[in-house]
A protein has these predicted regions:
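Glycine-centered, small-residue-biased loops immediately flanking beta-strands
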Residues: 100-101
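Rossmann-fold NAD(P)-binding glycine/threonine-rich loop
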Residues: 106-123, 134-142
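A short acidic, amphipathic alpha-helical/loop segment
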Residues: 90-95, 115-116
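Short internal alpha-helix immediately C-terminal to a glycine-rich phosphate-binding loop
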Residues: 1-35
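Adenosine-nucleotide cofactor-binding segment
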Residues: 18-21, 33-91
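A generic alpha-to-beta junction signature in SAM-dependent methyltransferases
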Residues: 9-10, 95-97
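C-terminal hydrophobic helical "lid"/dimerization subdomain
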Residues: 134-174
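Residues in the short beta-alpha loop(s) of Rossmann-like NAD(P)-binding domains
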Residues: 22, 45, 108, 132
């Protein structure tokens, strides 16, 4: 997430949306907020709305409701997708401002179904980036230290390994 902000030259006044607030997404919220951005969390779970606000989101949007997403058309400079499921990516493209970018951080196992029209006429783009170079990682750690950014973690004792695996399968892991 940090590498994306650096590579894409995201300004502190940018509007950033984070799609999915699990393991990667919760850090994306923290980094974007500390960067100075106005941050919106797209979450499919009402129970995660409060958590998203506590993690740094300025607002939340129900990602299961296409009308809620359509209502924010043209609002975002950057959308960071941390999910590993297929979504209606064209609706998310429409949520971008002209020259906005949909940036994939989660691995979606299928090919993305995208229309070229919103990209062409809005000069929008889709991309992704790796974690970053060792130098970028050092900068990320320094930034994290300065802004007190820590991951949210969960711990299970060894005798609860099966519970931990089920927790992971259900998409509840942090």
């Amino acid at each position: 997430m940090f590498n994306s902000l650096v590579q894409l030259n995201i300004s502190p006044t940018a509007r950033v949306g984070v799609i999915g607030i699990g393991g990667l997404g919760h850090l994306a919220l923290k980094f974007a907020r500390a960067w100075g951005c106005h941050v919106t969390a797209f979450t499919s779970s009402e129970s995660k709305e409060k958590e998203a606000l506590e993690l740094g989101a300025n607002e939340t949007i129900n990602s299961r409701d296409p009308e809620d997403i359509k209502a924010v058309a043209g609002r975002f400079d950057l959308l960071l997708s941390t999910v590993n499921v297929q979504l209606d990516w064209n609706t998310y493209l429409e949520a971008l401002k002209p020259r906005g970018r949909l940036h994939m951080l989660g691995v979606v196992p299928e090919s993305l179904d995208l229309s070229v029209v919103p990209m062409l006429f809005g000069q929008r783009s889709v991309g992704s980036s790796p974690v970053g170079s060792p130098a970028t990682i050092r900068n990320m750690l320094e930034f994290s230290s300065r802004h007190n950014i820590n991951p949210v973690t969960e711990h299970f004792p060894m005798d609860k390994v099966n519970d931990a695996m089920e927790h992971l399968r259900q998409g509840k892991a942090k």
